[in-house]
Amino acid sequence: MRYTNAKVRENYSRRFSIRFPNEELPAARPQETTPLYDLMLRDNNAVMGDTWGLETPLWFAPSAGEAHDIPSFHRSNDFEHVGAEVRGVRERVGVTEIANFAKYEVTGPGAEAWLDHLMTNTMPRTGRLVLTPMLNDAGKLIGDFTIAKAGEGRFVIWGSLGASVYHMRWFEQHLPDDGSVKVHRFHMDLVGLSICGPRARDVLAALVEIDVSAGNFRFMDYREADV
């Protein structure tokens, strides 16, 4: 409620102010942070944004003195730095924090049949991923998920953070009465990093002991490994 009140007051106080593209406003921040917050903000000059109350990195400045947005209707001060980040990922490798994805674990002997009923797509084989929408009783889209089959009776799901409370409520309302399915929603107890770019596989290979070569770790494959 503190966050909502502060944001409502901030919005009302600026009702006649000019709002710039991509402008981030300060009220009630930081409301929630990830375990990587201090590392990104203080050690890597991150400029943070507000994603449904969660502090997430927008871009990284070369020095602490430059780590702030200057809102503009033209190219702002982040243009050069964001461009360098994009080129780095396109040409070499980069890391993106993905804490702003909702994460769930569905377990139990009835998990696969339940997900097949709840989602529009068929569940994948063990060690594979699938992308699938979720519809309500009227056939309207209410969610879009990435689902991995981690093992028999165990699925890991990624979805929208902003809709996570609604989605969890929908899951709970449609659980079978026999207790054959359990759903757990992770929050800041499980965050993630995405390694991306042409050299992503090289970086991952140096961090884990499993074989992540192209022949053994294909597109849409799912593996669990210790780092």
Task: Enumerate the language-model features and the residues they cover.
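Glycine/proline-enriched, intrinsically flexible loops and inter-domain linkers
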Residues: R2-V227
